Amino acid sequence: MRNKGLSFYKKKKKISQELLREIFSWIFGIALSVLLAAVVVIFLGKSTRVVGMSMEPTLENGQQIFIDRFLYVLSSPKAGDIVAFLPNGNENSHYYVKRVVAGPGDKVRIADGTLYVNGQESKWVTERILDAGIAENEIILGNKEYFCIGDNPNNSEDSRSANIGPVEEGDMIGKAWFHLKSGTDGIGFIK
């Protein structure tokens, strides 16, 4: 018979199969969620960086943003949306990121540094605009045309510029909806 005194051997604890199943179930669920999120972002979204200071203070130069490419398949852009587009559909250009301030059928004019849409002062541009560009004379937007301008209008090449002009809906990549950290700005949804 064996003495029940000191024993230098540890008893091995068995891990139950139920616990293993639970652990693998969690790992599989997390991995599947990450994979599904990646597929959604890759196929329905796009990632790009803001070029220049035209969208400050909302977005900073070099800030990474995510673009929803699917939204405008179901609906049209609205005033206030921040969109990414290729100017005049130029595939060789970087994406321009600007705010929609007017849509199809709207009348746009910049007078005395103020942006007017349909005769009303725009709530989207509060800074005095130094260069009216082509909007010095009233522009009536055509079907599926949008007037887009940077939140920092005096440091922005946008729809006021003759080489960009009103943006065609077909040239829009999608709506910017999320940004990553840049400088002091944290991650979050774009307003």
Which positions does each model-derived feature cover?
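Protein maturation boundaries and topogenic segments
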Residues: 1-93, 167-191
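Short aromatic/basic micro-patch
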Residues: 49, 96, 109, 140, ...
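Structural motif
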Residues: 63, 78-82, 106, 145, ...
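Beta-strand-rich cores of mature extracytoplasmic or soluble domains
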Residues: 135, 140-191
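PP2C/PPM family metal-dependent serine/threonine protein phosphatase catalytic domain
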Residues: 117-133
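Mid-length scaffold segments of soluble, non-membrane domains
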Residues: 95-120
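Short, surface-exposed secondary-structure edge patches
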Residues: 54-58, 71-76, 99, 105, ...
